[in-house]
Amino acid sequence: MCVFFCVCIFLCVYFFVCIFLCVFFCVCIFLCVFFCVYFFVCVFFCVCFFVCVFFVCVYAFAHVAVCSVRPRRHVCACSRAYLHHRNGSGVYKKVIRPAGRSAHPPVGRFYTRPLFSLSRATCGPSSGTSAPRPRWRSLTLGGAHGPRGRSLFPPASPRLSLCGSAFCLSFSLARAIVFSLSPGSGARLHLRL
């Protein structure tokens, strides 16, 4: 009788130990899978972030190269508008371009606004206001349709959405970051922009 009782106790302990080991093993597997998935998700997001930064930098460098060859492109005008708006105060300003083959076309006077009002300066005043819509003046010697072609800044159009202004802001900010990280950025920033 005593032997039977001891065998029962041993079997019960053995059963509970087996259950405990199985549960512990399952928990370990779950934790390993969870940490592996978490690690791969973190790596994936880090790779996506660096890839996005890389393509933004490449796009900014390509934009600089394209603007050096064809400075009258709309995106170039858009980014330069942001850079002039950043230091603008709502008045007409005179910008002097450097002479040379790679310089931008001679520019005249144009409307500037602070950074926070770029979308309004681009798209005109919001509905319900009586403020006059700012008009872009010609940035080429030939006027809007002169010998040098169309001007860099066309008249403001209400069809331009806020997304266009946001694109200009983000794109120009990326260009500014690229210029600030490159050697000799101070001189080139004034020459190219």
UniProtKB/Swiss-Prot annotation:
The chain crosses the membrane at residues 15-35, 36-56, 160-180. It is a multi-pass membrane protein. The lineage of its organism: Viruses, Duplodnaviria, Heunggongvirae, Peploviricota, Herviviricetes. One of its GO terms (cellular component) is host cell membrane. The gene is B4. It is found in: Host membrane. It comes from Human herpesvirus 6B (strain Z29). It comes from the Viruses. This is Protein B4. Disulfide bonds: none annotated. Keywords: Host membrane, Membrane, Transmembrane, Transmembrane helix.
